[in-house]
């Protein structure tokens, strides 16, 4: 965070940075790679090194990736943390949403339901992630938003998928529609109840897909 940058958040080349900080170029390369893995900087040919805005989910991802691949933590524990955070913050988050965001959520639900009906072989994973994370964005809590974003990365890394039972998927998005309706009508407690019902339904349908190994 204390690295010297210009107005475009560009960081000097390593040879210059080495002189400014009194650190060897080899050590800086190691630190740069670590910073890049945490989403602190980006490195591009010709463009050089640029410091990125802080993203807590990017900082979490390397550790979570290691933990999931190494079997150090269980998916269910992280999913339970996500569930509790969403439910605890839901009413505060819903009250913070303006009509523009509510209308966007409404449109997202409508377009996704249409896609499910017209293209039943397509699972709306990206839309599902956006629906759940967008509700909490206006709280501007980087730690909360980072963990909620990281949940979807962990879900992907875990190898857990929802079987393409599209009657079930449509039901999930009908829950989303009802949640948005309650938010629009300022019935926040009712919206929270629907969110909890939806999450219980979602958790019941999560099944691991066994990974095949070949010797």
Positions of the model-derived regions?
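Short linear motifs at protein or domain termini
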Residues: 1-81, 212-213
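Hydrophobic, amphipathic alpha-helical faces that serve as interaction scaffolds
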Residues: 66-69, 81-100, 113, 126-166, ...
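Amphipathic alpha-helical segments enriched in hydrophobic/aromatic residues interleaved with Lys/Arg
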Residues: 101-115
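Short loop-to-helix capping motifs
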Residues: 14, 140-142, 186-187
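C-terminal all-alpha effector/ligand-binding and dimerization domain
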Residues: 113, 150-215
């Amino acid at each position: 965070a204390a690295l010297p940058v210009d107005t475009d958040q560009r960081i000097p080349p390593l040879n210059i940075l080495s002189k400014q900080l009194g650190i060897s170029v080899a050590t800086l390369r190691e630190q740069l790679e670590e910073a890049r893995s945490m989403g602190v900087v980006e490195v591009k040919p010709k463009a050089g090194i640029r410091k990125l805005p802080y993203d807590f989910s990017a900082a979490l991802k390397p550790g979570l990736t290691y933990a999931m691949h190494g079997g150090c933590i269980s998916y269910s524990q992280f999913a339970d943390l996500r569930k509790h955070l969403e439910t605890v913050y839901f009413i505060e988050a819903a009250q913070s949403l303006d009509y523009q965001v509510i209308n966007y959520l409404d449109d997202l639900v409508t377009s996704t339901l249409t896609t499910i009906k017209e293209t039943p072989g397509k699972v709306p994973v990206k839309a599902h992630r956006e629906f759940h994370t967008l509700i909490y964005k206006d709280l501007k809590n980087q730690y909360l938003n980072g963990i909620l974003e990281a949940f979807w990365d962990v879900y992907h890394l875990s190898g857990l998928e929802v079987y393409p039972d599209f009657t079930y998927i449509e039901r999930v998005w009908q829950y989303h529609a009802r949640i948005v309706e309650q938010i629009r009508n300022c019935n926040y407690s009712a919206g929270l109840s629907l969110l909890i019902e939806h999450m219980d339904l979602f958790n019941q349908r999560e099944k691991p897909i066994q990974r095949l190994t070949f010797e």
